[in-house]
């Protein structure tokens, strides 16, 4: 069971992403005009480090070495009128096999390497990585993507208690 709660007007969850870099490029997969990181929801009771290894295996079909935790993010955003509040763990990951041309999940999305210096030219999801990833040197960076003014104005009254 995924570690998430879904209501009528909101979605809350805990997820992981694999930040795979080679030769100053970031591995993503393309969904329409957006580029996403490999990752997904943590299962209830699952450690985040194990979750990212599982997601890499499920989506790419290769084993990996989960290295260091790079970012811990509290990310709140509105997507199609639904409030999303996600706690996210982004790990630096080294793949122990070849990258397939497409993901293995139902979508079979095309894998794409993006030059770190050109991230701003792409619609990377999550969007804050376009800004944060080129600045990262070492250690864990905590990021709070809040929109308190937007939340107070547009969403607070919609949440059912």
Kindly label every feature range from the protein language model.
Residues 31-35, 106-161:
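Nudix hydrolase/Nudix homology domain
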Residues 1-17:
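Acidic, metal-coordinating catalytic segment for phosphate/diphosphate chemistry
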Residues 37-39:
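Thr-Gly-centered strand-to-loop micro-motif
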Residues 42-65, 76-127, 161:
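Unchanged
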């Amino acid at each position: 069971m995924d570690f998430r709660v879904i209501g009528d007007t909101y979605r809350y969850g805990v997820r992981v992403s694999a930040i795979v870099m080679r030769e100053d490029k970031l591995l993503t997969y393309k969904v329409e005009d957006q580029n996403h990181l490999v990752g997904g929801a943590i299962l209830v009771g699952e450690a985040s480090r194990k979750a990212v290894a599982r997601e890499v295996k499920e989506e790419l079909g290769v084993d990996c070495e989960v290295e260091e935790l790079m970012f811990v993010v509290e990310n709140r955003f509105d997507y199609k009128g639904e409030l999303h509040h996600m706690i996210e763990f982004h790990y630096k990951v080294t793949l122990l096999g070849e990258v397939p041309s497409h993901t293995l999940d139902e979508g079979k999305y095309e894998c794409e390497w993006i030059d770190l210096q050109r991230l701003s030219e792409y619609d990377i999801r999550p969007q804050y990585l376009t800004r944060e990833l080129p600045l990262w040197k070492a250690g864990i960076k905590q990021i709070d993507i809040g929109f308190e003014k937007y939340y107070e104005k547009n969403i607070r009254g919609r949440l059912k208690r």
